[in-house]
C-alpha cells in the first residue's frame, strides 16, 4: 500500500527506532517514546487563591518527566495490539493496556500505513507486534 507523502515525511525518522517507556495514560490514551531521552522539568507554580488544597500542593512541587525526541500518543480512538496476528491488549482495561505496553516496549517501528477509506492506522514493529487504530465511530472521524 502506498502511503501519502505527509505520513512518509513524519514517520521516516522513526523507522528503525525502538519505542520505550510505553505506557497507558488517562482513559484509553496510550503513549510511546522514540529517540534520545531528555528531561522535561516543570517548576513549581503558585496556584490561584480559589484553588483547592490538593491543587495548591501539586502545583507547589517540581515535576520531572522523561520524554523521547518523538512522543507518539494514541488517543481519541479505539486501538488494539497484536503479536504475530494474535490479540494481546487494547484500551478496554488497564491490565489489557499494560499487556499491550509490555509487548511493544523495546520494539522498533518498521512500517506505518493508513487506510483513508476507513480511517484506520497500522503501526508494525520488528519483533512481530502490530498496533492498529480505528475511529470510535464513523461520525468521530
Predicted regions, residues:
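Surface-exposed, interaction-prone regions used to assemble/regulate multi-protein complexes
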Residues: 1-141
Amino acid at each position: 500500500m502506498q502511503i501519502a507523502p505527509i505520513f512518509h515525511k513524519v514517520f521516516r525518522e522513526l523507522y528503525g527506532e525502538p519505542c520505550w517507556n510505553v505506557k497507558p495514560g488517562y482513559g484509553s490514551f496510550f503513549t510511546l517514546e522514540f529517540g534520545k531521552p531528555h528531561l522535561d522539568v516543570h517548576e513549581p507554580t503558585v496556584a490561584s487563591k480559589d484553588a483547592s488544597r490538593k491543587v495548591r500542593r501539586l502545583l507547589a512541587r517540581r515535576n520531572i518527566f522523561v520524554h523521547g525526541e518523538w512522543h507518539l500518543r494514541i488517543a481519541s480512538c479505539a486501538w488494539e495490539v497484536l503479536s504475530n496476528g494474535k490479540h494481546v491488549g487494547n484500551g478496554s482495561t488497564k491490565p489489557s493496556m499494560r499487556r499491550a505496553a509490555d509487548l511493544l516496549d523495546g520494539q522498533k517501528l518498521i512500517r506505518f500505513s493508513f487506510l483513508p477509506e476507513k480511517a484506520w492506522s497500522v503501526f508494525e514493529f520488528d519483533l512481530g507486534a502490530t498496533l492498529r487504530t480505528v475511529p470510535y465511530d464513523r461520525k468521530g472521524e
